[in-house]
Amino acid sequence: MRQILAFALIAASARAQAPDAAVSTAAAAESVALPGGPPVDMDYLAYDSESGRLFIPAGNTGKVDVLDTKTGKLGSVDGWPTAKTADRVVGPSSCSVGRGYAYVGNRADSSICAVEVKSLTRRGCVTLPSVPDGVFYVAPTKEVWVTTPREKSLQLLSVKDPAAPKLVATLTLDGGPEGYAVDEQRALVFTNLRDKDKTLVLDAKARKVIRSFELGCGPTGPRGIAFDLEGRHLFVACAAGGVKVLDPVGRIVGRMETGPGVDNIDWLQSRHLLYAASGADGTLTVAEAAADGSVKSVSTVKTTPGGRTVIVDSAGTAYIPDSKEGRLLVIKISR
């Protein structure tokens, strides 16, 4: 399917930066219109660095759109179940990539299905006991973990056969899990308890919580998480605004200032850049994190109200879902 692009040049806002910030002069933005909208209900996206493909679960359309970030071509995996709720149509809503497969969570039938990245062919599926929220691949154990906040639990799927996910365990938590990150070197998993204002650290191999950190995000709690593999810093977004930087023992050693309404964030390890989108004021904030956990603003770019999640490709290009308008904002930061 051919993509429709609307080009605009968005000036970076220098006023929002600290005086010593390395502010970009401009950011080029493209708007990729998605089929079946508007609206197109989007939440968790997934990027495969090997193929350069961006997987975009598009809930109400019954599609998982796939953007080739190298060529700009848009394709899709079709035929996903949808279901009507009181206020919207739900369907595929989350995705993660590992070992040549994308694993797609569907809120319509509580399933997780494997999609072969190369052929975009759907393979095996498994049904969960609760509606999936976030889906993430845990490389050290060859598993896919799924946050199921309604049951205050994590569902663990074995993908030793990557085409055939299999439910193998349930981890019950003290609250509803929200967001995720993985330390592949140390086999650690991180997730937040949104209703408890905490971040949990889990031993992926032992399948248990080994520590928890108090965050102080406030009544709306924490949302997205990212992890710096080199510095071992954990970045935790607060829904009320801002991203806190935690060291390995949970001390807050830095803070990235953002507008309110932040959800999923992302981290570009190769450039030590942290990305956070604020849905309340429609901005993307990019900051550079130092070895000590301190952060320095690089750019603040105007996006769109409601754009509260961001994912980044290997080149540093940011992708922000705009569900209301049925499009994906593509923002290239000039430095």
Indicate where each model-derived feature is located.
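Positively charged n-region of N-terminal signal peptides that target proteins for export
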Residues: M1-I4
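Predominantly soluble domains enriched in secretory-pathway, periplasmic, or organellar proteins
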Residues: R15-R335
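Hydrophobic h-region of N-terminal signal peptides that target proteins for export
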Residues: A8-A16
